[in-house]
Amino acid sequence: MSIITDVYAREVLDSRGNPTLEVEVYTESGAFGRGMVPSGASTGEHEAVELRDGDKSRYLGLGTQKAVDNVNNIIAEAIIGYDVRDQQAIDRAMITLDGTPNKGKLGANAILGVSIAVARAAADYLEVPLYTYLGGFNTKVLPTPMMNIINGGSHSDAPIAFQEFMIMPVGAPTFKEGLRWGAEVFHALKKILKERGLVTAVGDEGGFAPKFEGTEDGVETILKAIEAAGYEAGENGIMIGFDCASSEFYDKERKVYDYTKFEGEGAAVRTSAEQVDYLEELVNKYPIITIEDGMDENDWDGWKVLTERLGKRVQLVGDDFFVTNTEYLARGIKENAANSILIKVNQIGTLTETFEAIEMAKEAGYTAVVSHRSGETEDSTIADIAVATNAGQIKTGSLSRTDRIAKYNQLLRIEDQLGEVAQYKGIKSFYNLKK
């Protein structure tokens, strides 16, 4: 009765109006699952391949019909007849069917859509929530959210190199309260921006994208918003995080961090050592708890220096650096580079490999942050993954745009369903830092 009888993919649109995949999996029992695939703007060069058509006459070359066809004509034939509950076997079968190290033949977007849909169909068959199916009876930790309230870099037209300025309600007693704190700061920030005559339009991930005078202007404005909303900045209240997305402004030929790419003439151009110094200055000055991709994805020496300098005080998250891949994570652990991994399901392409990366991180004492992409959909699977794995942290955008709010609302539902069992760790989510 739990046997897969049909698999069907279609092309749909993501939050940026670009094509992506939606996959449906059907079983003999009538149990059904649907998965939608996100897409990134700033992508690591080692990520699994997102298959696009390249036909400029259709969706500016970004169509996904090839990936759709791969699901409907190749993957479907291979997995029809499998028990939908056998997630690992199905994921491994698709990896083998693709046969490339980066899923470049069938497309990670094709494979991931199926992987998510299979898991949802299995949960439907067993009549349990997705987070319970994926995580079992020990599922209980609601993630501390990283809320991206200011967008810069490749996510907006704001003249700031850092891609994301985030707030984290680490002092909140529950996820529900943490979400309220974040929403109130978001609205306080909007009011402050209006009073300064700055634009309150939002970027890809729902954060504001004003023309600040620089990084510190952005941080100072966030601190004012935290105060205006009635909260304190720090471990008992709300802390700040960056996604530097440094690979987006790293000049490989000159081996420098060229801030002029986003901030214009006169902006800083920093060596690897100077980049570390700059980040340390910011940490010394402001209540910063997490920095993502502070160094370029291939600047391993820079990462090691950054970790040596700040790794006991600040969460140093590898996104482009690790691309949710156990091979790169294992090297980072061995060489003491970073102390946390960002988990993006489409960087690696299957739920099985995603869970393996989270498990490896935890075993090494690294934290794991489950994350969205800048091109999102209404699919809320990552909310369930964050709870299923007790990851403790989630990064899923600002307090606007339904594609972001869908994940927060799902977490509110899960917190209600878990009842007294639910735990919100807040500052304790950063278990590998000396506080």
Swiss-Prot record:
It holds the Pfam family Enolase_N. One of its GO terms (cellular component) is extracellular region. The active site is at 205 (proton donor), 344 (proton acceptor). It is an enzyme of class 4 (lyase). Keywords: Cytoplasm, Glycolysis, Lyase, Magnesium, Metal-binding, Secreted. It catalyses: (2R)-2-phosphoglycerate = phosphoenolpyruvate + H2O. Its cofactor is Mg(2+). Its EC number is 4.2.1.11. Binds a second Mg(2+) ion via substrate during catalysis. Pathway: Carbohydrate degradation; glycolysis; pyruvate from D-glyceraldehyde 3-phosphate: step 4/5. InterPro entries: Enolase, Enolase-like_C_sf, Enolase-like_N, Enolase_C, Enolase_CS, Enolase_N. One of its GO terms (biological process) is glycolytic process. GO terms for molecular function: magnesium ion binding; phosphopyruvate hydratase activity. NCBIfam families: eno. Belongs to the enolase family. Catalyzes the reversible conversion of 2-phosphoglycerate (2-PG) into phosphoenolpyruvate (PEP). It is essential for the degradation of carbohydrates via glycolysis. This is Enolase. The gene is eno.
